């Protein structure tokens, strides 16, 4: 998918954040194998973990200021309005009720992302929500200032709250690095203790004591999400490492279990280590076909239980059942029926069935999706974050995408691979432009291609959406670093138009293209094994996906970024076709030339000027899938030579200059990108993770020296970075007249916080989140010292 957050995650030595996620953002993977059982048995529950930092080892103020620079949100943090008022007002009352209840389900489900972020994230959310719910911001501001807090520090407190609410936790949805407040611990504590919530509710003080050190902790493990000892994750218990994930994933593959809906906790029972694979569900009891009793595999013990996120999923299902009453047709009703069963039982098959009804629901007035969808933030690349969205179809803007779909089967022929590497038949998807009412999770994308289930996408179909009111918030005013004045002018004029083209091509013909070569349980191949050649080597095909293997499980840690790179490359490559640009309304050759140039320039600029923010120089890890993908494409085009791309340091330690020779895009650029794209597709089709990893790691390398010392230049890029936009979303409510009302908010820090206060107008949700943390804390002893 194509995320606008600039476009929101590579962890560990396997650069994990790069797991397949079909969306476009705004802004060495080992194959699964059996590991010696001694690894598991030698790791007790509290075995030699790097603990969270605590108050005794926090840096001193001067050191802290420098250390936190990359982790704070500035007081100038921009907030923008996700405007959907006119689109919402055009709905019928029945449609508004459907949108309202589905939005409620999405918001409640989106809170699961807090639990999936860090052990402390739900408590930080609860602390801040209780504080702002108890009194108006101007009242709290007056009390804080009277207590000696500066106006700037109070603003920093508000900005931190915005960051936690917007990212569903205290780690960035785009990049997975920690967010810490841009004010001192002392001033933060002063504000908390000045609040009415602190005075009136004893539990607020208790919550604060639990999280105050965790809020500011910036030891190396706290800086990013990932496996111990290099990061924090809640998809796995504290004592799980990359090696544990390989043990668990090997067992899951042997059982044909996809891990989208689960977390894994390594516990000790009766002196034995057990991997408890826990499914998200309302039900907790055992059920044949879903849970599994304790069993041994390769010397390790496993079981599947359920009941994770129970109370939140109960709320989700209650709202979905209300939405079902206002469904427009059988497709929507059946879709919801299966979603409810999925969340009740912890059944991935039921969610797949719901997704099948969803793809049949062509051209709905209201588009929705909900569930455990995207796998960016799991260090192992398989467990999915919960999200849900509700949006209204913009028929006028959708027309161009419909034409793209109608011609897609022919347009795919422009891609550089041969027919055997393409799907047997093209399944025309729905492709619409939407105005988002609700997008709950750790960030808001600009475009989406779902479902992510391989067997449905390849054999049954999928949908693409472009989120128009998200695209409308692209910044076209501020200076653009590292470009000439002429290029800045062109970028500002054509960036949105070019981005819309890239979104469309990335989603429909990027994620929507290509075939996976498989052998099934009966030994039947889904491709002509005798006559299909490897386009890279010219030799017969010798690798393919085995029964039980999926792209996700095979490509694991690099999968997300690798797939985003493939889709981005498809977008660039096909944007050279003028008949495609005409579909988007660009018929004048001079305008087409500018669209092509700006599309290529923009992606290359993102790859060199923005992406490096998402590289961690300590761990040498990429922290974000799309950023790594763009850096890789930039390196491919830079290495193509012949003056196509040039990057030079114009002011030592201060500035860079990027130039792209537009006269060579259609020649040097086309060939270099076509050759690279062919390799990307061949390695994906043939499940050749070894060749894919070798190539991808080469282009992902951030050099310390040489003609392009990217590691050194990263500091220059960080000095020029701009904060990512936070989008304030409307709320819906049913009035006394039983009609749905839309409530919008000012695009300010105060307005954004108010939207969350009114979204949850009492502390019930805080009680619920706190109870989940209490239940789970035994799995995360390093956070809670238990």
UniProtKB/Swiss-Prot annotation:
One of its GO terms (cellular component) is plasma membrane. Residues 130-594 are extracellular. Binds 1 zinc ion per subunit. It comes from the Eukaryota. Keywords: Aminopeptidase, Cell membrane, Cytoplasm, Hydrolase, Membrane, Metal-binding, Metalloprotease, Protease, Transmembrane, Transmembrane helix, Zinc. InterPro entries: Dipeptidyl-peptase3 (IPR005317), Peptidase_M49 (IPR039461). Zn(2+) binds at residues 506, 511, 564. GO terms for biological process: proteolysis. It catalyses: Release of an N-terminal dipeptide from a peptide comprising four or more residues, with broad specificity. Also acts on dipeptidyl 2-naphthylamides. GO terms for molecular function: aminopeptidase activity; dipeptidyl-peptidase activity; metal ion binding; metalloexopeptidase activity. Its cofactor is Zn(2+). The active site is at residue 507. Degrades neuropeptide proctolin (RYLPT) by cleavage between Tyr and Leu residues. Belongs to the peptidase M49 family. This is Dipeptidyl peptidase 3. It comes from Drosophila melanogaster (Fruit fly).
